[in-house]
């Protein structure tokens, strides 16, 4: 498919009613890169002789096929580089516009709810009218965000800050132009097998274990209420188990030695109040400890793969790969046979590069996303690992 150019003032419906300013007719490269819960960008090159070369500007939009399955997607142009022999155009998926819609006050009302209901309730906190719709197959209820989330964007409410929907609920984001879905799981188990030396061109296994742990030491800063005078203060709570242990085991870690992750759960314990009696005892100590343990165990369950395994990232030469892989999607699961000592592993497709002109994938990456647990530790683990 040839890319189509639209002016910067195109309405939401206008992208799907006509061909805008027309097709680029001297486009030599048009690639779409998408990562799981990550970037979704356009890299495009045209010749100076293209009919739209003197028309295209930053802030305009390009509509183009971004994978074999979805309708053509809209990308906003954010950079143009002009050289004598070529013009390079960079764009980002239309959903990035959610990052420009900023909250006028902390978008939190303290009530637990499902993702769909939270999305609807939170709209009143944002400055601009929101053209994006939202759906989710996740039906559990949680609280999101906190009073610390001042001037965050609508996009950050979805993913990108402590207490965001992805942070609290987990799941995988799927973007289809002006509709956003938070799915418990994106993709399916394809049953396709990739074998090193047969249809895998290279393999790379990260040697670092920076984000792999055997234990977690949860802690939180919570509210302490003195029942003698009704005064409240901040209290540093650390986990104390039934045998006075201060850590919780992370199952199935590949490490042969012990390594502890110290982790701050303050944002998930904001509703907890520890009550101190007139005798100096804690009235609800065990309930508070049980809550901290529950939050830690939920975290372990949600991020088990990243906490326990070294990621195996595999780049695939799709020219030599099974034709069936062209029908796979971001988030699908395949079987990798490394060919050494019978080692096999199931891995998700976490990154795709799609050639929109040829309408085929030219690169896929399998494995665990690198930007998950490490980024969250940087933001949330105030006590250090």
Feature-to-residue mapping (PLM):
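Short beta-strand-centered interaction patches in the first periplasmic/extracellular domains
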Residues: 2, 9, 76-98, 136-225, ...
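Acidic, low-complexity/disordered segments
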Residues: 89, 227-290, 294, 305, ...
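Short conserved beta-strand and strand-loop elements enriched in small hydrophobics
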Residues: 5, 58-68, 331-339
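Short, surface-exposed secondary-structure edge patches
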Residues: 49-55, 322-327
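Solvent-exposed edge beta-strands and adjacent loop segments
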Residues: 1-37, 195-209
């Amino acid at each position: 498919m040839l890319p189509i150019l639209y002016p910067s003032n195109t309405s939401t419906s206008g992208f799907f009613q006509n061909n805008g300013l027309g097709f680029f007719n001297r486009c030599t490269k048009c690639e779409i890169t998408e990562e799981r819960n990550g970037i979704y960008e356009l890299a495009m090159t045209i010749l100076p002789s293209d009919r739209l070369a003197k028309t295209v500007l930053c802030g305009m939009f390009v509509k183009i096929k971004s994978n074999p399955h979805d309708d053509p997607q809209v990308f906003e142009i954010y950079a143009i580089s002009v050289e004598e022999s070529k013009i390079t155009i960079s764009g980002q998926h239309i959903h990035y516009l959610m990052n420009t819609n900023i909250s006028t006050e902390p978008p939190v009302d303290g009530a637990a709810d499902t993702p769909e209901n939270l999305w609807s309730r939170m709209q009143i906190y944002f400055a601009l009218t929101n053209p994006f719709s939202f759906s989710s197959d996740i039906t559990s209820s949680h609280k999101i965000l906190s009073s610390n989330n001042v001037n965050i964007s609508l996009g950050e409410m979805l993913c990108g800050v402590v207490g965001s929907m992805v942070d609290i609920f987990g799941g995988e984001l799927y973007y289809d132009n002006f509709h956003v879905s938070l799915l418990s799981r994106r993709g399916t188990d394809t049953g396709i097998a990739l074998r090193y030396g047969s249809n895998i061109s290279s393999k790379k296994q990260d040697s670092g274990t920076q984000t792999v742990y055997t234990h977690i030491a949860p802690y939180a800063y919570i509210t302490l209420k003195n029942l003698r005078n009704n005064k409240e203060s901040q209290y540093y709570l650390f986990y104390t188990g039934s045998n006075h242990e201060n850590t919780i085991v992370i199952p199935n870690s590949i490490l042969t030695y012990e390594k502890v992750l110290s982790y701050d759960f303050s944002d998930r314990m904001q509703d907890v109040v520890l009550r101190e009696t007139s005798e100096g005892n804690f009235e609800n100590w065990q309930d508070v400890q049980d809550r901290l343990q529950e939050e830690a165990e939920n975290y372990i369950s949600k991020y088990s793969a990243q906490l326990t395994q070294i990621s195996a990232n595999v780049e695939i030469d799709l020219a030599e790969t099974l034709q069936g892989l062209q029908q796979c999607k971001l988030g699908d699961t395949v079987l990798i046979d490394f060919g050494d000592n019978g080692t096999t592993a199931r891995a998700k497709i976490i990154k795709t590069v799609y050639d929109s002109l040829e309408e085929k994938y030219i690169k896929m990456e399998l494995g665990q996303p690198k930007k998950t647990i490490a980024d969250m530790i940087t933001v949330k683990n105030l006590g250090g690992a």
